[in-house]
Structure formats: C-alpha cells, structure tokens
C-alpha cells in the first residue's frame, strides 16, 4: 500500500484484511503543503509513486494500492488511469487507486446517484464531484468540513453528522471520502439508519485490492462486502435495504449512540519510508508482518439498540 506522508490510519486498513493476507504500507516523502489540490498533485506525481512502489518490491506484493482519494482524482479519470499504469510499470504487478476503487464499487452496487461527505475544502470537494460527473455519477447532496490538516483527528460523531446532512433527495449510496478519515465503526450504523450502502475511501481501497487476490474484505454489516447472490438477483443497493427492512415489513431501528463507539486511535506521525501507498500479498509462514484477525468475533451492542449490529472489537 502506498499512502500520503500524513496518513495515520494504518490500524483501520488492517481491520478489513483477513488473517491469511499480509499488508505492507509505505509513504510518500513529506511535503510542507496543507491539504489542497496542489498537495494532491504533488503526492501523485508518477516519479514519486514509482519510488514508493519500488520500495515495496522486496516483499513481493501481488497488488499495489494507492491509498489517497484526492491524489487519485485530482487529474481526472485520465490521470487516474495514468497513475495505475505508472505504478504497474514500476512494480510489475496490478495496481489501483482509491478513486478507481470507488468507481468500481459504485458499478458493483449499481449506484449512479450518491451523497458525498468529505473533510476537504470546497474546492477539493468540487474537484471530486467533477471527477464523478465525468464517469456518470451524480452527487445528490454533499457535506464537507473545510479542513486543511489533521484530518485523522476528526471524531466518528462528526463523520456521522455530516452523513446525515449530506443524504438529501434520492441517493443510491453514500460515499465518505479521504483515507485519513476514520469510518470503519461508523459504516454499519449509518447503513442501518440511512437504509443504503455506505462506502468509505479506506473500505473501497481494501475491497478492490483484496478482490484482485480473490479474497474478501472483513467487515460485518457493510453492504459492499455482502456475498454476491445468485446471478440475476438485484444489486447490493436493494440487498442492504432488505437486510434492515424485509419486503412487506416495516420496523423501527434504534441506532446506538455514536458515543458508544471506541475513540479514534490513529497511528500518529510516521516517518516517511518511501512514496505513497500500500502493498498487499498473501501472508507466508516466514512473513514478519503480523496479520489482522477477522472482525467476525464481535461483542453485542448496548441493550439500548433494537438491532443486532455488532460493536467492533476494542483496539489492542
């Protein structure tokens, strides 16, 4: 995995990884620029990406993922494809980006109208909306924080509040942008409340990367990760709604307080060890990289909830 120099949510990425897969992360060199379109261009330069990918070569990854949303949408669809080609040339393995993974996930869901949440400024948020328009996706509503730094410090409550604000009109799904925004524990609650698939930058990145390995991302109550039904059945958009409200049956859903979620525990500042992004490969017995246990063993939510949604395992 190649990630920006300020990426601080390594722990969150691991939560989607099954225990037989190894994840390795490297970062792009530090750039003294606030989060902006200029920074997005700097951290997505092909030379920088190539160096990051080559830094991962010794671990023999089977897929390379560039974990940065703004860095992969700033050049438009053409620029995103060029980034993938540059990384593939450097590492000689399949490569993908967060924005490309988002488009892939929306196609998988059959979603063409989305609500959008970002921590960015208005100009960066608009650039993402323009990218989506180019690939045929309409943004029905949006909410953004206007941040230029320390995005990983945003609490889950703020993410949930923005999601509620953004979902107006008839959206097929909600997308929470930025790989530095914590989302893993918020997704199940938002899907139950909003009755639609909820996608996040880290989620779609890991889903798409693991998919190329023939593996499944770990994440209970996340619509994108539902197993495919028999051919001919509806897309996940309907499946997610039915999971909480079966056809012909209406019931009240009580979402547990977002305060019940564990605090965000970022990895903190990490010294750059190379260009942006993560590498993923099946774990071998000799691997020194620890693996993440599946998130299927979970504790129940507080009794105040009428749903059987699981509470994520506490951080170690």
Enumerate the predicted regions with their spans.
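Short, well-structured alpha-helical segments in soluble
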Residues: 45-59, 159-171
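Hydrophobic, well-structured mid-protein blocks that either form specific transmembrane helices
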Residues: 83-136
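Intrinsically disordered, low-complexity proline-rich tandem-repeat tracts
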Residues: 241-244, 254-314
